[in-house]
Each structure stands twice: as C-alpha cells, then as structure tokens.
UniProtKB/Swiss-Prot annotation:
Pheophytin a binds at residue 126. Chlorophyll a ChlzD1 binds at residue 118. It comes from the Eukaryota. Tyr-161 forms a radical intermediate that is referred to as redox-active TyrZ, YZ or Y-Z. It comes from Conocephalum conicum (Snakeskin liverwort). GO terms for biological process: photosynthetic electron transport in photosystem II; response to herbicide. This is Photosystem II protein D1. A quinone binds at residues 215, 264-265. It catalyses: 2 a plastoquinone + 4 hnu + 2 H2O = 2 a plastoquinol + O2. PROSITE patterns: REACTION_CENTER. Disulfide bonds: none annotated. It is a multi-pass membrane protein. Fe cation binds at residues 215, 272. Residues 345-353 form a propeptide.
Length: 353
C-alpha cells in the first residue's frame, strides 16, 4: 500500500512538472525546449563573462605564441575577446577533462569551444521554444522560421566555417575587434565581397532596415484619430482592440503618390509577409554563402580579366581588391607562415600584369 501511494505521489509530481513546463499561463513560457535552453545559455553566458574578464592568453595559432584576450591581461572592452581554440586542437572535442590540467585547457583556448557549442545549442532551443509556444497558443509557426535566419548565420560562422577550414582556431573571436578581424581575414581569404550570396545578405539587411523605417513612419503618420485635438492620439486606443488603429488605404495612397502606384501594398498581410521575408531570405543566403566559402568555394575572381589588344592588363576594381586582399592576408597570422598561400604557390599570380 505504501509503495502504491509513493508511486502515485511521484507520478503527480512529474505530472505537475509537465503541466508547469508546458503552461502558457506562466509569466515566461518554459517549454520542453526551454528545459535545455536555460542551462546551455546560462553556461555559455557564465563562461563568457568569466573568460572575458580573466582568461589567460591562448596559443591560437599553435606556434607557442599566445594571444591575450581578457580584461585582466591588458585589454579593454573594444580590444577584448574570447580567443578561439588553438590550431593544435583543430576540430577535436576539447572539454576540461581532455586536458592534462586546467592551465593547459585555458592555454589551448578551451573556453571558446564550451561557449560556442553551448551557445549554438541554446539559440537552437530558443528557436524551438518559439515554435512550441506558437503551437500551444494555436498560432502559425512563422516567428520561429524568421528566427532561423540569425541561428543559421551564427551556426555558419561558429561551426560550419571552422569545420570547413579544419580548426576551431578559424572561428570568429567573441569580441568587438575580434569580429572585425574575422571579417577582414575572411575577405582576404575568400573574397566575400564578390560573392553573390553576400550581396543578397547586404540587400536583405539594409533593405529590411529601410522597409521597417518606411512602414513604421507610414503607420504612425496615418493613425485614425479617436480623440480631440486637445488629447493625445494614443489615448484613443487600447491594447488588443479589434478595430484598426491606422488607415492602410491612406498610407497606401500616400506612398503610391510619392513613388508610383504599384510600389505600395494595399493588403496588410502581403505587406507584413514582405517585411518579414526580405531580411530573412537575405540572411539565409549569407549563411549559405559562409557555409560554401567554408569549403573554399569563394567569391568571384575577375583579376586581370581585362586586357588590351596587345595582351597588356588594364587594371579594374577587381585588381584593386585583389591587391588589398593580398595585403590583408600577409598581415594575418604573420608569424605562423612567411607568405600567404597564394604567394607561396609555385607560380605567384602577377599583380601588375
């Protein structure tokens, strides 16, 4: 009898836990994805803060020349970063127990792996949690689909690119200047500015910003006034009301006269789908571009493609970019190798023709 009661009590505790996790009445929805998201993001955040403040220098290139990234070792907020795991580790899974000591683990950049892997798992669970909450509330799943764009971008930069290049040391450092360094080196090695998928991503981000600003300004400029001139227009509305708060016909008419008739939307659902899809698709393409360049399928190369009737090279903007890329590549990992890979080839490419 006692055993039966204990089993029932145990089952009820588990049942209460399940109900609490999946309840949409909580101030913050937990969800089953949240059960995994919370510890992974807390781990990533905690290790990041501690390492950013106090981590010792890391031998990023695997040549016994450690690079300092933390505040206590001479950096500031701008120059500080979590230095990627050493090239000596490569793509090996490198938890603390794989190192001979904590000092060795820190020297080889172990914190970078633990942060990145927990972070990627955490943001993927956050995306799943968005879908889960939408499902519980009877909503459509497009919020999670939109969030998949930054998740794909982060996965491309922190996981796919290191896999393609053969080492976590090629991942993006976790800091402000480290991010810019990653961008410069990426341009030098992969000519990303000449990759069409990156161009689509730029159009998506800047276009999305423009369209959001246009939409917000049009809506706030065409509110339906429910109050007198002596009261704020905001006082005429309440959260969740069924009536329209702005006049889309007026906004459509204004914008149609400002540009031309078919440049504006007269359907609210089409408009908001466009506002969501434009930047999301652009960032998807950028993530796909990073993932292809990870395996050295690089941007277009038009170097020395224009010649005169006598075969002499007429320099174009592509040749200027090529020269800049070589300069950036020479500066990168200057002690790890004497020449960038394309200069160290059997036949170096001519720059001046």
């Amino acid at each position: 009898m006692t055993a039966t009661l204990e089993r029932r009590e145990s089952a009820s505790i588990w049942g209460r836990f399940c109900n609490w996790v999946t309840s949409t009445e909580n101030r913050l929805y937990i969800g089953w994805f949240g059960v995994l998201m919370i510890p992974t993001l807390l781990t990533a955040t905690s290790v990041f803060i501690i390492a950013f403040i106090a981590a010792p220098p890391v031998d990023i290139d695997g040549i016994r020349e450690p690079v300092s990234g933390s505040l206590l070792y001479g950096n500031n907020i701008i120059s500080g970063a979590i230095i990627p795991t050493s090239a000596a580790i490569g793509l090996h899974f490198y938890p603390i127990w794989e190192a001979a000591s904590v000092d060795e683990w820190l020297y080889n950049g172990g914190p970078y792996e633990i942060i990145v892997l927990h972070f990627l798992l955490g943001v993927a669970c956050y995306m799943g949690r968005e879908w889960e909450l939408s499902y519980r509330l009877g909503m459509r799943p497009w919020i999670a689909v939109a969030y998949s764009a930054p998740v794909a971008a982060a996965t491309a930069v922190f996981l796919i690119y290191p896999i393609g290049q053969g080492s976590f040391s090629d991942g993006m450092p976790l800091g402000i200047s480290g991010t810019f360094n990653f961008m410069i080196v990426f341009q030098a090695e992969h000519n990303i500015l000449m990759h069409p998928f990156h161009m689509l991503g730029v159009a998506g981000v800047f276009g999305g910003s423009l369209f959001s600003a246009m939409h917000g300004s049009l809506v706030t400029s065409s509110l339906i006034r429910e109050t007198t001139e002596n009261e704020s227009a905001n006082a005429g509305y309440k959260f969740g009301q069924e009536e329209e708060t702005y006049n889309i016909v007026a906004a459509h008419g204004y914008f149609g006269r400002l540009i031309f008739q078919y440049a504006s939307f007269n359907n609210s659902r089409s408009l908001h789908f466009f506002l969501a899809a434009w930047p999301v698709v652009g960032i998807w393409f950028t993530a796909l571009g990073i993932s292809t360049m990870a395996f050295n399928l690089n941007g277009f190369n038009f170097n020395q493609s224009v010649v005169d009737s006598q075969g002499r090279v007429i320099n174009t903007w592509a040749d200027i970019i090529n020269r800049a890329n070589l300069g950036m590549e020479v500066m990168h990992e200057r002690n790890a190798h004497n020449f960038p890979l394309d200069l160290a080839a059997v036949e170096a490419p001519a720059v001046n023709g």
